[in-house]
């Protein structure tokens, strides 16, 4: 710890630190070596000044290096490229599970989706809460998850299963009761290291910085979005987008109408607990969900299909997602994944 003291001193003086220095600090955290008081001081110092691109990237580097390894997928999967559909959470709205449901649709439409998720942060039902309702084994072995990705086009990676070291920060984060750098790290530390990302953030001020971070982390293509209060592509208002493509970042707004969708009220997307949200997801994936639910999922799946190269525009992606939902293929995929996650046919638990 003593050799890191000069880094702490610079933080306390309001100075920025490098990507490598931040990586060193966060490596201490995930190895359980950092004093909780020092950890709190570090996180608050960064928060008060505002975390830099290098600092967020360095923290992600440390957590990815410490994570349980995800086995290399097949050559076909690597050639096509992997996409994640993920949000920071913490937007304060308790909506249905849009990004999780969208993952099934994007995969059923042809994308290779490795979704990294956790239990709920702000809503009554997070990604893993929902999946457990469908009998999807969240603690499946990494080899089983890899086989699901190769064979079915979809796997879910439960964050605590891969990032055990993050538990060392939990007491400090709970005691601070405020957002810190950890609140934006979750979407950045997918152990499958996706090539493409649709990433929703809880604050419009984060859209550009997080896109810069994805570029620094060598993500090939991405859309970072904030949809009128939600960490999703919105159907109730405009979505602010920063798109990363071929090393360039462009910023624009996307409306529901531009995607060929009707505008809904945000109240139409209200979620409930895991059991109720599971029934909502089941209805959507079977092709008879409520219009606002179906279109919200199609918008997000459609943008994921676009960013992963399956379609030439978000509009085309959304149309393909709607066709996929109407066919019921996404629900069949859910059933296949539940079966595969619990069986030894694709790997060992």
UniProtKB/Swiss-Prot annotation:
Details of cofactor binding: Binds 2 magnesium ions per monomer.
EC number(s) given by UniProt: 2.4.2.18
InterPro entries the record matches: Anthranilate_Pribosyl_Tfrase, Glycosyl_Trfase_fam3, Glycosyl_Trfase_fam3_N_dom, Glycosyl_Trfase_fam3_N_dom_sf, Nuc_phospho_transferase
Pathway the protein contributes to: Amino-acid biosynthesis; L-tryptophan biosynthesis; L-tryptophan from chorismate: step 2/5
Residue positions binding Mg(2+) 1: 99, 232
Name the record gives this protein: Anthranilate phosphoribosyltransferase
Amino acids binding 5-phospho-alpha-D-ribose 1-diphosphate: 87, 90-91, 95, 97-100, 115-123, 127
One Gene Ontology CC term in the entry: cytosol
Protein role: Catalyzes the transfer of the phosphoribosyl group of 5-phosphorylribose-1-pyrophosphate (PRPP) to anthranilate to yield N-(5'-phosphoribosyl)-anthranilate (PRA).
One Gene Ontology biological process: L-tryptophan biosynthetic process
Annotated binding of anthranilate 2, by residue: 173
Assembly mode: Homodimer.
UniProt catalytic activity: N-(5-phospho-beta-D-ribosyl)anthranilate + diphosphate = 5-phospho-alpha-D-ribose 1-diphosphate + anthranilate
Positions of anthranilate 1 binding: 87, 118
Matches recorded under SUPFAM superfamilies: Nucleoside phosphorylase/phosphoribosyltransferase catalytic domain, Nucleoside phosphorylase/phosphoribosyltransferase N-terminal domain
Naturally occurring in which organism (per UniProt): Shewanella loihica (strain ATCC BAA-1088 / PV-4)
Class of enzymatic activity (EC top level): transferase
Annotated Mg(2+) 2 binding sites: 231-232
Molecular function terms, GO-annotated: anthranilate phosphoribosyltransferase activity; magnesium ion binding
Cofactor: Mg(2+)
Keyword annotations from UniProtKB, A to Z: Amino-acid biosynthesis, Aromatic amino acid biosynthesis, Glycosyltransferase, Magnesium, Metal-binding, Transferase, Tryptophan biosynthesis
UniProt record similarity statement: Belongs to the anthranilate phosphoribosyltransferase family.
């Amino acid at each position: 710890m003593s050799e890191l003291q000069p880094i702490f001193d610079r933080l306390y003086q309001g100075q920025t630190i490098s990507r490598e220095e931040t990586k060193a600090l966060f490596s201490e955290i995930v190895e359980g070596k950092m004093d909780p008081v020092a950890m709190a001081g570090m996180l608050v110092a960064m928060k008060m000044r505002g975390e830099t691109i290098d600092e967020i990237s360095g923290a992600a580097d440390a957590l990815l290096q410490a994570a349980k390894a995800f086995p290399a997928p097949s050559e076909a999967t690597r050639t096509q490229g992997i996409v994640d559909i993920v949000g920071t959470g913490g937007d304060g709205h308790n909506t249905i599970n849009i990004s999780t449901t969208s993952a099934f649709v994007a995969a059923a439409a042809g994308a290779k989706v490795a979704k990294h998720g956790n239990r709920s942060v702000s809503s009554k039902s997070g990604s893993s809460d929902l999946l457990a309702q469908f009998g999807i084994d969240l603690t499946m072995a990494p080899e089983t998850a890899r086989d699901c990705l190769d064979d079915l086009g979809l796997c879910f990676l439960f964050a605590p299963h891969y990032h055990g070291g993050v538990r060392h920060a939990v007491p400090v984060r709970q005691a601070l009761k405020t957002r810190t750098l950890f609140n934006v790290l979750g979407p950045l530390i997918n152990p499958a290291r996706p090539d493409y990302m649709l990433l929703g953030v809880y604050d419009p001020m984060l859209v550009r910085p997080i896109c810069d971070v994805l570029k620094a982390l060598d993500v090939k293509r991405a859309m970072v979005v904030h949809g009128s209060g939600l960490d999703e592509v919105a159907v109730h208002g405009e979505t602010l987008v920063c798109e990363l493509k071929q090393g360039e970042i462009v910023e624009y707004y996307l409306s529901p109408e531009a995607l060929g969708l009707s505008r809904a009220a945000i109240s139409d997307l209200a979620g409930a607990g895991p059991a109720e949200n599971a029934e909502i997801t089941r209805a959507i994936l079977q092709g008879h969900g409520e219009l606002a639910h179906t279109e919200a999922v199609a918008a997000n799946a459609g943008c994921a299909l676009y960013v992963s190269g399956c379609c030439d525009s978000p509009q085309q992606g959304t149309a393909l997602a709607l066709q996929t939902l109407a066919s019921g293929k996404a629900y069949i995929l859910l059933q296949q994944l539940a079966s595969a996650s619990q069986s030894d046919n694709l790997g060992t638990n």
